[in-house]
Amino acid sequence: YNKLKNLESNNPVIDITNVTRYREILDYCSSIPDCHAVLSPDSEKGISYTIKAGIMAVQEQKKTGMQDYYMFAVADQPYLKSQSVIKLIDKVLENKGNMKSVFSLRCGDTVGNPCVFHSSLIPQLLSLEGDKGGRSVAKKYDCVYVDIADERELTDIDTLSNSKHTVTL
């Protein structure tokens, strides 16, 4: 959140909505000015629930008219650099007139989060089920990749064992 929030302060086109299944995170976000957060207890059933909760929260905030693109990022990528996210956002803004639909970070053959979708793909994202994420939608389109040099930035640490493995890299 802090990395994205720093980007938001430099770029008025960015608005951040946090989706969490943890009440503690929701409470924490409510103590921060301009931190939009939504509780999604169903997220434990799969990533599709998190995606839907985020989209619906943005739509409920009546921001849909302003949103051309939706970026989905996970909170457990400790090595993700702000510069990489800036490169991704710059690529989206640079391609805005070309109507590209999907943007993602990549290191070699490894593709990862964050991923950005044009608002025209929202119906497809809302139709996702279970643990199917946005990548299943992204694969249907000519994705614009932003190449990064360090694959560790794409590392997603979901468990304590992943964390221990990552530390030894």
Kindly give the residue locations of the regions a language model identified.
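Conserved beta-strand segments of alpha/beta enzyme cores
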Residues: D15, H36, S101, D142-V144, ...
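A general structural signal for well-ordered alpha-helical segments in protein cores
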Residues: L26, S48-I51, V85, I122, ...
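Conserved beta-loop-beta/alpha segment of the NTase-like Rossmann-fold superfamily
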Residues: E44-S119, P123
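Glycine-rich "substrate-gating" loop/helix at the edge of Rossmann-like oxidoreductase active sites
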Residues: V38-K45, Q77, E151-L154
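Conserved alpha/beta core of the MobA/IspD/sugar-nucleotide pyrophosphorylase nucleotidyltransferase superfamily
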Residues: P123, S127-L169
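Conserved N-terminal catalytic core of the sugar/cofactor nucleotidyltransferase
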Residues: Y1-D68, Q83
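Hydrophobic packing residues within well-ordered alpha-helices of enzyme cores
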Residues: I25-C29, L88, L125, T166
